[in-house]
Amino acid sequence: MAVNISKQIVLNAGEGLRLQSGPGRDLIFKVTGEDTNGAFDYFIVEVAPHGGPPLHVHHFQEETIHVLKGRFKIHIGGSIHYVNEGGFAYLPSKVPHAFLNLTDEGGEIIVVYTPGGGHKFYEELGPISRAAGADRQLIAAVFEKYGMTLLGGPLIAD
């Protein structure tokens, strides 16, 4: 499927739309679905030591993860995988997944969502999930609004 994208975007390190997800996850969107006619999002996630999202599923989006820094435990559909720097994981839609930075230092991954539009989810989720005493029901409602379901808590190290 060809996507007609005529907008040119060039960004240097650290540039892009900065958003925050849950505690310990900062995001830098290099392009959003708005830039790509809905085709994809491309963003960097700075993951705190031993940080990662809760177990969840995307009902419509596929996700890829490319590890730039750190070592990650990735849960994909009931299987556990360990991915080092330079490693890659493809997470199909409708498959439960989560990841965890296993290192004592911050990790960094590139994430691509297909189709795009994920930045809107993070714009809404960030302030809610980072609030003191974050309301899990409110967080779950944001997931549902954007075509995802929260299934459990974050992964733990072995």
Specify the residue positions occupied by each region the protein language model found.
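A short, N-terminal "cap"/entry segment at the start of jelly-roll beta-barrel domains
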Residues: M1-F40, A132-D158
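Short acidic-glycine-tyrosine-enriched beta hairpin
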Residues: V10-N12, G78-P96
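Conserved short histidine dyad/triad with adjacent acidic residue
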Residues: I28-F29, D41-H58
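Short, charged/polar surface micro-motifs in flexible loops or helix N-caps
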Residues: D35-G38, A48-G52, R71-K73
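Ligand-binding loop in jelly-roll beta-barrel domains
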Residues: T36, S93-H119
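Hydrophobic small-molecule pocket/channel-lining residues, especially in calycin-type beta-barrels
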Residues: G51, H59, F72, K120, ...
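Glycine- and acidic-residue-biased ligand/ion/polar-headgroup-sensing regions
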Residues: F60-F72, G77
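A hydrophobic, small-residue-rich beta->alpha segment in the mid-to-C-terminal subdomain
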Residues: E108, H119-A132
